[in-house]
Structure formats: C-alpha cells, structure tokens
C-alpha cells in the first residue's frame, strides 16, 4: 500500500462512499455508510469534525470551507455547518439519493436519485427546491463543469446546460457500452471521462471541434483469468486539477493507476491496496491524492474489513 494512512479516534465502521477535498484547502470530507460525515485536516493530521446523519451517506460535496452537503440512503439532502457542527435537512428525493454536486456558476446544490429525478436546491431561498426534472432513469453518477451538467443513466450520458434546463441539449450512449460507474470532468477542456463496471475508460469531448482528442476508450484494468481478459469494475476516476492531462483510476481489486489523457499513456501504478478503491480525490493543487480503501457493496467477493483512507503525495 502507498501513502500515509489517516488516523481516526473512532474508526470508520462501514464502507466509505466519497472523498472530497475542499476547493481552497486541504480539508477532506469523508462520507460513509456508517451515517457519519467526517472532516479531516490533512495538514495537521487531525479529525476536525464528525457528524451523525441518521442514514448511510452515499455522496458529499463542499459549497465552501464552512458548508457542505450530503445525499443519503433515506433520500434526504442534508446541509452541514462545519464551523458550528450542526446538521439540517433541505429536502429529499422519493427514493435513495445517489449523487450530489455543487454548481458555483448557479450557486445551487444539484442532487440525483433512484427516483429518476434531478433536483436543484438554492439554500438562499425560503423554499430551497427551485427546480426538478426527469432524468429518464435511475441516475448512477453526475459531474458538473462550468455551465454543463452531465448525468449518467446506465450506459448513457445526458448533458444539460445549467442556463436552460428544459431538457438535455445532448444525449448519447457512452463508448463503454455497459453501465457507467463513475465520471469526472476534464479540467482543461469541455470534456468528461467515465469508468465502467467492466474496467473500461472512455474520454469524451462532445462539444469540441478538435481533431485528435475528440473521443477514445480503452480497457484500463484488465485481469487475466482462465486464458482470457476479464474487466474489473472501476469505482473511481479523477483528473488532476493542474491541467497536465493526468487522471487516476481505482478499481474493485485495490489498484490505483495514473494515466495521461493527452498522450493516452499509462504513467504509474501504486502498490495494491488491501481492499477495493471506493473513492479518489485530488486536492486543489494536485499535489495530494486521497485514496479510500474500502468495500463498496458492488461485489460479493469484497472483504468487509475496516475501511482506510490514505494520502499519497505526488
């Protein structure tokens, strides 16, 4: 295993679902199935906050240094005052809420769920829910980049313009052709990268006229079994914010691999972790990579040992 392991006074008791670094510091959010949202100060190697949420947390995001949000298995969208250590509910989905992101362009929280809804929340308003639209299916993952929101339903990608939400302005089947497990925005371009349940990565630039970097896909985590290549589910994919074109993938067998999207080359593979890679997150400088080694409830063969979070310095 590679990196410094974070120490928690009260161990994380169930699967880690999401890691998120703050946009401007090395504060790290850790959302997990044990109902706790944890805030960890990586610089001082100390736990700053631990808040119970009464439901398994499936995703989290920052608004700023003092405010964050989560989506839960009970459908509720919760807001956390990280300075006061308080939690309140801003609304809910009619089924499990799977994903949550914050749009800095709109100043709104965007959540999705198994109720096939995309919901937009503005906590500055008395009625926080400002818009809701049908996703056309249960949403697996989302990402937001500028004014573009990308919603993944099964193997399809639906792109919305946040300035005009009447309908998706572009919908197409991803190159991976199987259910999409994770998605990330490409920092240096209006594009996206997705990881699939069968170990494929697809990099798409749907709104560019560039010649050579439009779109491509490859099998990123092949494993040889019985004389043939089997794919291993990619649970996490993240681009470095430094604009180098580097991105990392994490799979269900504990491997973290870095790649260069521009040269289409494999760069490095970290020593194998003891459990699945559940989530990855870069800090705002691209110098730190947070890695969650944890079961994910995606594979019956996973080991349900205590989850661990590591910081790898690049």
Curated annotation (Swiss-Prot):
SUPFAM superfamilies referenced in this protein's UniProt entry, alphabetically: WD40 repeat-like (SSF50978)
Compartments where found: Nucleus; Chromosome, Centromere, Kinetochore; Cytoplasm, Cytoskeleton, Phragmoplast; Cytoplasm, Cytoskeleton, Spindle
Record's signal peptide: none
Keywords from the UniProt entry: Cell cycle, Cell division, Centromere, Chromosome, Chromosome partition, Cytoplasm, Cytoskeleton, Kinetochore, Meiosis, Mitosis, Nucleus, Repeat, WD repeat
Keyword Protein transport: no
Domain of life: Eukaryota
WD repeat boundaries on the chain: 11-50, 52-90, 92-131, 134-173, 176-215, 229-269, 272-311
Principal subcellular localisation of the protein: nucleus
Pfam family of the protein (one): WD40
BP GO annotations: cell division; chromosome segregation; meiotic cell cycle
GO cellular component term of the entry, any: nucleus
Function: Has a dual function in spindle-assembly checkpoint signaling and in promoting the establishment of correct kinetochore-microtubule (K-MT) attachments. Promotes the formation of stable end-on bipolar attachments. Necessary for kinetochore localization of BUB1. The BUB1/BUB3 complex plays a role in the inhibition of anaphase-promoting complex or cyclosome (APC/C) when spindle-assembly checkpoint is activated and inhibits the ubiquitin ligase activity of APC/C by phosphorylating its activator CDC20.
Record-stated family: Belongs to the WD repeat BUB3 family.
PANTHER family: MRNA EXPORT FACTOR AND BUB3
UniProt subunit comment: Part of the mitotic checkpoint complex (MCC).
Protein name: Mitotic checkpoint protein BUB3.3
Organism: Arabidopsis thaliana
